[in-house]
């Protein structure tokens, strides 16, 4: 994994972490159930491991797809961007949520190479 790939994929995790920190600091109603230290540590760890998680998920996914998958399905490349964007957001959010287990898996795989 290159530094460029890591920086490109950590931006979504940083964005989510900054939104979380902003929301817990601007909470005027006294609901601080999400503002625990353990939750903050988990979000910071997930932010750091998010690119590794995405790398591991992509590696596992492409291991099971045949090489001619995208050649046979040419309509996938002609799909409008507006229809793909919600799925990309859900995919990035899934990578962030699963960042700790899959991120550690990605780290193990990278160190193995």
UniProtKB/Swiss-Prot annotation:
The keyword Nucleus does not apply. It comes from the Bacteria. Coiled coil: none annotated. The keyword Transferase does not apply. GO terms for biological process: bacteriocin immunity. It holds the Pfam family Microcin. Transmembrane segments: none annotated. One of its GO terms (molecular function) is toxic substance binding. Keywords: Bacteriocin immunity, Plasmid. This protein is able to protect a cell, which harbors the plasmid pKY-1 encoding colicin E1*, against colicin E1*. This is Colicin-E1* immunity protein. It comes from Shigella sonnei. The gene is imm.
């Amino acid at each position: 994994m290159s530094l460029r790939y890591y920086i490109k994929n950590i931006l979504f995790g940083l964005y989510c972490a900054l939104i979380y920190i902003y929301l817990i600091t601007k909470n005027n109603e006294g609901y601080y159930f999400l503002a625990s230290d353990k939750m903050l540590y988990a979000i910071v760890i997930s932010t750091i491991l998010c690119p590794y998680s995405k790398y591991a998920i992509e590696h596992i996914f492409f291991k099971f797809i045949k090489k001619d998958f995208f050649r046979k399905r040419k309509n996938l490349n002609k799909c409008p961007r507006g229809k793909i964007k919600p799925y990309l957001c859900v995919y990035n959010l899934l990578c962030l949520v699963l960042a700790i287990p899959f991120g550690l898996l990605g780290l193990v795989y990278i160190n193995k190479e």
